Amino acid sequence: MSKRQSAKYKLDRRMGENIWGRPKSPVNRREYGPGQHGQRRKGKLSDFGQQLRAKQKLKGYYGDLSEKQFRRIYDEANRRKGETTENLIGLLESRLDAIVFRAKFVPTPFAARQFVNHGHVKVNGRRVNIPSYRCKPGDVIEVREKSKQLTVVLESVALAERDVPDYIEVDHNKMTAKYVRMPALADVPYAVHMEPNLVIEYYSR
């Protein structure tokens, strides 16, 4: 198992949940955290503990964003009109790597970040290699022609492990995706229950 895979599944074990709904997740076999003390029964979390856990889970879901990156997104969500909770989710889902993942061009957010970094994606006909690139409604994302035969792409497109949400229109034959609109929390097909309201409470302390 690669270091990246190990880190990904470590998050699953720490949270005790199959964060991305992957069939190979170790929590499908056990329900305790990583390490020799992982089997000890956990006590009830304090309010702060619940808030921290919610933040770590949401931050980790999107390829384990750095605290600086995640805080910057929260700050923007907080400045925007409307509910900060909905703004936060909408901004996270408008990242280029998130859309590549949702479109099923690759199997995980980690793979999506690497895929974009390596220059396999174009937005509106132009090559973009920045995972955090903010997509706007109407933007067309496509896999570059020479990248369409990569094993990771072919295998991900062939598998039906998750549905493509309706805020993205995908043509898997052409390997293109149109970002239709910024989604609300209820639109996002998380494999586990997310609590962005607790994330807001964490940063509002």
Swiss-Prot record:
- Species in which this protein is naturally found: Chelativorans sp. (strain BNC1)
Q: Name one GO cellular component term.
A: small ribosomal subunit
Quaternary state and partners of this protein?
Part of the 30S ribosomal subunit. Contacts protein S5. The interaction surface between S4 and S5 is involved in control of translational fidelity.
Q: Which family does it belong to?
A: Belongs to the universal ribosomal protein uS4 family.
* UniProt KW Ribosomal protein keyword: yes
Here the disulfide bonds are none
Q: Which PANTHER family match?
A: 30S 40S RIBOSOMAL PROTEIN, SMALL RIBOSOMAL SUBUNIT PROTEIN US4M
MF terms (GO), sorted A to Z:
rRNA binding; structural constituent of ribosome
Q: Which SUPFAM superfamilies does the UniProt record give?
A: Alpha-L RNA-binding motif
- Which domain of life does the protein's organism represent? Bacteria
Family matches, as InterPro entries: Ribosomal_uS4 (IPR022801), Ribosomal_uS4_bac-type (IPR005709), Ribosomal_uS4_CS (IPR018079), Ribosomal_uS4_N (IPR001912), S4_RNA-bd (IPR002942), S4_RNA-bd_sf (IPR036986)
GO biological process per UniProt: ribosomal small subunit biogenesis; translation
PROSITE patterns assigned to the protein according to its UniProt record, in alphabetical order: RIBOSOMAL_S4, S4
Under CDD domains, the record lists:
S4 (cd00165)
Q: What is this protein called?
A: Small ribosomal subunit protein uS4
Residues in S4 RNA-binding domain copies: 94-157
Q: Could you tell me which Pfam families the record lists for this protein?
A: Ribosomal_S4 (PF00163), S4 (PF01479)
Per the record, which residues fall in region Disordered?
Answer: 1-49
